[in-house]
Each structure stands twice: as structure tokens, then as C-alpha cells.
Amino acid sequence: MEVQRNFFIFAFLFVSFLLWQAWQSQMFLNKKTNEKIDPIFHFIDVKKNKKKIFIKNDVISLVVNMYGGDVEEASLLAYKDTLYSSRPFKLLETGSDFIYQAQSGLIGKDGPDSSINDSRPLYSANKNFFVLGPNEKELRVPIKWLSKNGVIYKKTFILKPNRYDVQIEYDVYNPSKESLNMNIFGQIKQTINLPKKRNVYSGNFALQTFRGAAYSSDDNKYEKYKFDMIANNKNLHIMTESGWIAMLQQYFAVAWIPDNLGKNTIYTSSLDHDTAVIGYKSPIINIPPNSRSIIKSKLWIGPKIQKEMKLVAPNLDLTVDYGWLWFLSQPLFKLLTILYSIIGNWGFSIILITFIMRGLTYPLTKAQYISMAKMRALQPKIQEIKEKFSKDKQRISQEMILLYKKEKINPLGGFLPIFIQMPIFLSLYYMLIGSVELRHAPFLLWIHDLSSQDPYYVLPVIMGLTMFFIQKISSTNHISDPLQKKIMNFMPVIFTAFFLWFPSGLVLYYIISNLVTIIQQKFILSNLEKNR
């Protein structure tokens, strides 16, 4: 049966594509150089210090350790930890079994965070809690440290309303008679092996999303770098004037965006093979005697919202990774957001986008069924050729080619819509698991999260039933091979099992697509019957 055979081909192509993509990614990563990193970055580790301050605007809440001024914890107030939780999602965390921090400081010959000193500055603040008020345009949180030689270091965290980017500003006043030379650095470090309580993957679906490091440079707009590469000391050492460094997981990102002070160094490193580090170091910054210098950088801690990330740094929005089919996923996402702005429900937006896509591909679908009908009409002649030249396979092929030419039929014409639909299906899959806007997005009744699997498996069963109806309409009477007929009859069950762990939004798309197929199939076939 042609339709069911097409489903089988679709599944095969889907799995093959994902395996090929994983292989390509691994091959690319293996080409990276294995460079040794300056050991100054290894000393910056967790030290117990009870002195902390708390900073909050309306979307993020930060905990800053006054020893070094690192961001040790960050909660995203607009996102729940889990679907039914009242707690906000904690992106950065410092615990006994898991560390995820955003660190920054001044290193080099005269830097207070330099490994030469084997310590970091212990900053002070005038209070412990800082909250952005309802009518305030920005919140400035200064912390200060005075060195032994009288140099004043002021590190200021600047937050704005409804913004996930935090400006980090160093104000260094040098009252001495000698110049100071230092570098600003920013790095992100994270425990490689996740504890069970911190599972960032969606549902039980086997195709996990990327969790690891990433960067942007003069030569590469966006590159991912696996934690495994860092753990095996296959480290990055890249000189670049532009760019950023980041750590990514499904839906969320932490990124340092350095100020353009010349050529920065992007590096990776491993601490005890269990903690991955990616960071940047600026060129040497000279602070003349009796003068002050302002040194800036920016930190993103939040969801991967494309339109906001694009404003913070060039190419940062590319961390919303739609894979190889980004050129399809991006316009699909834009169309989906337009529909959502009108309808107000992501599920109904998916249904509407399904109708739109199936409407656009209708000419191909019609051509497919016409080709299938012609092929079915030719079956007696094809069978006659096979019986007549049963002992000569080459002659059978030649005669069948001549028959196709005579009848003006392309035997592969029925497969074209499948090749068109597969990229659409894949791009929608990547969009659903990669767009934070769809995280915990409800539809109707029991479907409270379109980005995760149906908790009761109702949608996959409905999808299987729609396949069964397509099978009944198409009929399998023309299939002579008993084994092939059994396989085709069993396809709805196979696909139902295959879709159990798919995001419910994707299963919804396939259900609607199948219903459209049933309607289009009955309409086209009935017209063909009338025109005979």
C-alpha cells in the first residue's frame, strides 16, 4: 500500500537524518585543537564564604558571593521550576553535588583576582538586599574593595526592568605613582555530570537537546563545544575581537559578552575532569598613575528569547538552535508567533499552521495520488511483464521502463510529497523542543505542556487511529505479498509506539495532518473515479 509504505520511508529517513546529524557534529568537534590553557584560570574555584548579597529585578534574582563578586545563584522569576511547581526555575546554582556559576574578575600582573596572589578580593556593600523598584529605570549595585597599596576597586552590577542582561562595570582608581596592568576575564563553569534532580531534558524522549559550551568569534558566528571535549582536555584557544562565550541547555543560556577592548582570548578548561569552564580574557588594560579606568562586560542569564538576545549581542540569538533545518524552523516559528498573537493558544496555532502547510503542499499531494492511481491501474500490465520475463530480471526492468514512458508515468512521483513533508516535520520538531515560548505552553484539557509528551498517551493513540483510517481508505487489496501486507497493516501500531515520547505539539501536528490527508485523499480519489 503506497501511503503506508510512504510512512515507513518517512520514519526511516527521519532516523537516518538524525544519526547523520549526530555523526557530522562529532566529526566537526574532533577537529578542534588541543591547546593548553594558562593555569591562572584553574585557581578560581568555590571557596566557602557566608558573606553574600541578593539582587533582584522583576525577572531575575541573583545571589553574589562577596569573595570575588561571582554570581553563584540565579533564579528566573517568570519561569516555573517544573510544570506544577510554584518555585521559580533556578538556572545558576552552587551546591555540594552541582555547581553552575558566572565568574568575573581582574587578573594579570596587578589584578586583584590574579593567581599570583592566591586569593580574591573580599568586597563589601552597604546592605545585603537590592531590589529594583516599580518605577525605577535601573538598579545599580556597587561593591568595593581597597587593596594594600591604596587602589580602589568598585564592581557594579547594573540591572534594568524586564531584562535578563546584567551590565558588570569595574571602576578602578589608581592613586599610586605607577601604572597598573591587568586583564578582565569572564567565565562560566558547570559540573559536567548532572545530578538526578537537575534533569534539563524534556520528558523521556530519547533525542536529547544540547547541553554544553558555545562561542561566537570573528571566524564563526556560532559554534557549540561539547563538555566531553573539555573533559578530555581538547580545549579552545581562540583570539577574536568580537563574539561571546556561553553555556547552553534546553531553553536557557548563560553568556558573557566582553567589551571590545581589542583581541580577546576565548578559552576552555577542565577542573578535575568534572567541571567544564569556558571563558574569555581581554588584552592587557593599562591604568596610568593617579587615574581611573572603567572596564565593562555584559552577562546574560535567562531564557533563549531570540528577539531579546539579538539586541544584547550579535549572533547571540543563534543559541536558539534549530539544527540543520534552521532555515525552515525560523520562518515556521515566526509564523507560529504571529498566529499565537491572534489566537492566544499555541495548540490552535499549531493546528492552523498545519492547515497552512498542507494547503501549500496540496498540488504535490494531488500529483502524488494521481501518480499512485496510475501506478495501480498499471499493476495488471506490470504483473504480465513479470510473468512473461520471469527468468530475465534485466528484461523485466527494461520493459517496465518502456511501459512507464509509454504511459507517461514517473514511478517515483508518489514519493515527492514525503520528501517535502519530512523537512517540515523535522523543523517543527526542532522548533518545539528549542523555543522557550512553548515550554509549559498549555493546549486543552489534559495537555498542559505542548513541548513534552502526552502524559496519558491519548494523542499518540488518536494519531494511530488516523493512520488506520488512511489505511482503510487506501485499501491493501492490491498488495499480493502476504508479508508486505502484514507489515503495512501493522504500521499504525508501530507509529503509535514511535510517537509515544514525542512532544505533544508535534503529535498534534501529525494528527491534524493525517485528518487533512483523509479529506484530501477522499476528495482526489472520488474526482479520479468520476473522470474515468
Curated annotation (Swiss-Prot):
- A GO MF label: membrane insertase activity
BP GO terms, sorted = protein insertion into membrane; protein transport
Q: Name one GO cellular component term.
A: plasma membrane
Q: Which residues cross the membrane?
A: 7-27, 336-356, 413-433, 450-470, 492-512
Give any Pfam family that matches.
YidC_periplas
Task: Specify the superkingdom.
Answer: Bacteria
- CDD domains under this entry? 5TM_YidC_Alb3 (cd20070), EcYidC-like_peri (cd19961)
Give the subcellular location. Answer: Cell membrane
Keyword tags: Cell membrane, Chaperone, Membrane, Protein transport, Transmembrane, Transmembrane helix, Transport
How does this protein lie in the membrane? Multi-pass membrane protein
Its quaternary structure? Interacts with the Sec translocase complex via SecD. Specifically interacts with transmembrane segments of nascent integral membrane proteins during membrane integration.
PANTHER family to which the protein is assigned, alphabetical? CYTOCHROME C OXIDASE ASSEMBLY PROTEIN COX18, MITOCHONDRIAL (PTHR12428:SF65), OXA1 (PTHR12428)
Q: Which family does it belong to?
A: Belongs to the OXA1/ALB3/YidC family. Type 1 subfamily.
Per the entry, what this protein does is:
Required for the insertion and/or proper folding and/or complex formation of integral membrane proteins into the membrane. Involved in integration of membrane proteins that insert both dependently and independently of the Sec translocase complex, as well as at least some lipoproteins. Aids folding of multispanning membrane proteins.
Would you tell me the protein name for this molecule? Membrane protein insertase YidC
Source organism per entry reads Buchnera aphidicola subsp. Acyrthosiphon pisum (strain APS) (Acyrthosiphon pisum symbiotic bacterium)
> Upper taxonomic classification of the species?
Bacteria, Pseudomonadati, Pseudomonadota, Gammaproteobacteria, Enterobacterales
